[in-house]
């Protein structure tokens, strides 16, 4: 990611070091056992990365989308599960930062900046599945008391058992439609909140993603992250850009690592009987070339999108969606080519390309899914509303 200034470069360098010295060291075990990468998340906090985008006046790094994308890209090269946890944390903390209604905003952001508070998003629900913009749950006024109560069945929440807070969505009281919504901050350690089961997925196996049942959780106006009915707007204007940029950068990081691993394999592996290298085969060089081109195409679109977000126009939301779509597709294509170029060494897990191959596919089913993105982009290009 180009265009990072001196202040941001310090964080990117720190991310690269942590990714190499901590994330990559534990990535194979995290993947094999499906455990939460506690060592990696702790290392992010120790190195000031947990508060990367928190306001500077509250102790955070005050960095924007460009540095965020560059940091996530580096983290994904070491451990995509950690990069996913981090993306959800930053996206959720940016909702907190954007709030003008949350009573505990500043105290939470100070803790985020200090690496003492991990947060995440809790949007998708069992009834509406990956259509995260249509919550089934609804806030209900508490009988005879001030405040609200909500029950929900969140289908998948990253860092479900490890987060200190969830940024959650629900319909407002008496909502006429699912889009008549509100975002609120939930404390997952409350007795009304219960995680169910463990995550045993194909890829991103260490992100502690689990269904969460919420039964009669009590909250007040001071827990709301936006005004009643403004949930959809906040999702569109804050959640979606940060999440899309972060997951695009994660996919790009997977691509970069796949390219480097494949290159090293082609250079370092030999046909002893002929005295030649794998790189001497034109078909393998061609696959590596295709991998590199697809990777840099996706990275270039994301860099352009970040520049658009610095100076938004009416077309900026389309670029946000396109960058996520392009990067997710690139990650699938690039890791597929890496598996073919790696041959038996890749398929037998002698090189970690197989883990990247699986991690790359998780993005396709993560809302907004690839199918949703194609539809959203098509709707935008033809003048239809996004949701």
Language model regions located:
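Glycine-rich flavin
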Residues: 38-46, 50-158
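Glycine-rich phosphate/cofactor-binding loops in nucleotide/flavin-utilizing enzymes
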Residues: 344-387
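C-terminal helix-coil-helix/basic helical segment that borders enzyme active sites and/or dimer interfaces
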Residues: 24-32, 296-326, 339-347
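Alpha-helical transition-metal enzyme core signature, strongest for iron centers
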Residues: 252-255, 259, 291-298, 302, ...
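Glycine-rich beta->alpha junctions and the first turn(s) of the following alpha-helix
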Residues: 199-294
């Amino acid at each position: 990611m180009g265009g990072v200034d001196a202040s941001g470069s310090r964080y990117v360098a720190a991310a690269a070091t942590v990714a190499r010295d901590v994330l990559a060291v534990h990535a194979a075990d995290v993947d094999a056992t499906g455990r939460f990468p506690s060592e990696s998340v702790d290392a992010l906090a120790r190195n000031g990365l947990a508060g990367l985008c928190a306001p500077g006046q509250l102790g955070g790094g005050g960095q924007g989308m460009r540095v965020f994308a560059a940091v996530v890209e580096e983290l994904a090269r070491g451990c995509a599960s950690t990069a996913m946890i981090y993306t959800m944390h930053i996206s959720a903390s940016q909702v907190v930062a954007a709030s003008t209604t949350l009573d505990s905003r500043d105290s939470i952001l100070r803790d985020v900046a200090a690496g003492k508070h991990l947060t995440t998003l809790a949007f998708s629900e069992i009834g509406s599945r990956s259509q995260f913009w249509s919550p089934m749950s609804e806030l209900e006024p508490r009988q005879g008391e001030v405040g609200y109560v909500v029950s929900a069945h969140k289908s998948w929440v990253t860092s479900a058992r490890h987060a200190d807070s969830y940024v959650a969505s629900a319909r407002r009281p008496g909502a006429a439609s699912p889009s008549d919504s509100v975002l609120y901050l939930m404390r997952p350690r409350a007795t009304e909140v219960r995680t169910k089961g463990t995550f045993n997925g194909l890829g991103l196996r260490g992100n502690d993603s689990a269904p969460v049942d919420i039964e009669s959780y009590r909250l007040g106006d001071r827990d709301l992250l936006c005004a009643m009915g403004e949930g959809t707007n906040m999702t569109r204007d804050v959640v979606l850009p940060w999440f899309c940029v972060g997951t695009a950068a994660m996919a790009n990081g997977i691509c970069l690592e796949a390219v480097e691993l494949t290159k090293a394999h082609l250079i370092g592996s030999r046909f002893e009987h002929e005295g030649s290298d794998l790189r001497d085969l034109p078909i393998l060089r061609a696959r590596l070339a295709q991998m590199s081109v697809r990777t840099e195409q996706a990275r270039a679109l994301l860099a352009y999108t970040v520049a658009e977000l610095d100076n938004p126009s009416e077309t900026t939301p389309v670029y946000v969606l396109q960058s996520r779509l392009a990067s997710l597709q690139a990650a699938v294509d690039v890791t597929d080519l890496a598996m073919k170029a790696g041959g038996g060494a890749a398929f037998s897990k002698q090189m970690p390309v197989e883990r990247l191959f699986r991690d790359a596919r998780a993005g396709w089913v993560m809302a907004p899914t690839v199918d949703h993105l194609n539809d959203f982009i098509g709707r935008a290009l033809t003048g239809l509303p996004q949701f």
